[in-house]
Structure formats: structure tokens, C-alpha cells
Amino acid sequence: MQNRIDNLVKWIRTQVPEGGKAVLGISGGKDSTIAAALCVRALGKENVIGVLMPDGIQADIDDSFRVCSLLGIDYHIVNIGNVCYALTQEVDTNFLNRWEFKSAHDNPMIKTNLPARIRMTTLYAVAAMYPNSRVVNTCNASEDYVGYSTKYGDAAGDFSPLGDLTVREILTIGDALGLPHYLVHKTPSDGMCGKTDEDNLGFTYEQLDDFIEGQYDKVPDDVFAKIVTLHKATRHKYRPIPTYERWRDNI
């Protein structure tokens, strides 16, 4: 594991230009905590900037503060609540007289994905304040496999240190880094509906990681089917945007 950590640290150093900083959202969850810790090892705490982005009130924001304090990194707090509400309201206004549409405020796709996209926009705005800086993607391979992220939201970024690692592997890294157990093993949730990520997915990360690792005998049939279905339905999130190619003119 130490070899992997050393390689991650070396790789991160190649992703941020000299004099630049790594900018990442600090949610207080395992992924952002571990990604931030790796960036600190690679670049020094003075070159890592945390951004706390509550949507109105964030119940566990104290964990975000603890991460920044633990790592000794500078941070900014940008509350996205008013922006999310204002944009949703503007969209809603365009559909007030269209009876076939529900209110934008009640649209689950908007409620789930808009805050994630506003957060990524915020990260790039903060990064723009620091010359030559890069935004860190904090998604992991397990969530990516079943599309448990927002396209152009938390799925975006300039480089992804955890993107090829499963949750199981990331937890091992967090423990090896000596990070507090309650941060590394904190039950992940979306912070909106009160449910855990595993509740939303309908299976555990243990089962998902067993599937990804090819240990199919450990995965119940119904869970196997859910994972396959989600993977097929969300592949568009991780493929390059389809582009019309001029050679088709000659078909």
C-alpha cells in the first residue's frame, strides 16, 4: 500500500503546474478527505485549497472544518444555496403556464444535479483566483462504475487521483495515511434526502467492489442485475462527448 501511496503522490505532482495549487471541495466525506491528504503530501499544505460549499445549511459541515484543520490547509466557504434557488426559480418561471410540467423546485433531476454542477462551477471560479491552479476530481471507481455522480458536476475536474480505485482500496489508503477513523469510515450520504449512498443505490459498496473485482459468487443475483443495469444506463457520463466526424460526409 505504501508503494501505491508513493506513486499517487508522485503522479499528483505532475498534474499541478509549478506555482499552482490544487483546489478541491471538502465535503467531510472519505473521498475528499483522502484526496486532500494525498495532495498535501504531494504539494505541501500551502498549495492545497479547500472549498466548503453548503447548500443553505449543511448538517455535517463541522467535519469539513475538521478536515481543513487536520491537514492545515487554507479554505474558502461559498454557500451555494441562494444561487441554486435563484436558478431553479428562473427555470420554473419559464414553465408556469405549462400544465404538463411539475415545478422545477420539485424536479428530482434538478434537485439532485443542479447543486453538484453549481459546486463544480464554484471550484473553477475559486481556482481562477489562484494562477496555474487545477481542480481535483474526487470521484472513485466504484461510484463511477454505476454512474453515481453528476455529469459536469462532481464527475468533472482536471485530474482524478482516486478515479481508478475502488471504495475498498480508498479506505485502505485512508487508514494507511493515518487519517481519523471516523472520517475515513464515515457513512457516505448525498446530504439531501437523509438516505445513505447505499440506500440510494440499493446495494452495498462491498457488493459493488466484489462485482468490480470479479468476485461474482459473493454478489446476490438481484444486486448483480442492478449493477449491470446501472452501468449500462450511465456509461454516457464517462465517455467523451459524441462528435460528428467529417468523414461521415462521404458515406
Where do the model's predicted regions map?
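Alpha-helix N-cap/helix-start motif
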Residues: 60-61, 145
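Short, surface-exposed alpha-helical segments at coil->helix boundaries
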Residues: 33-36, 61-65
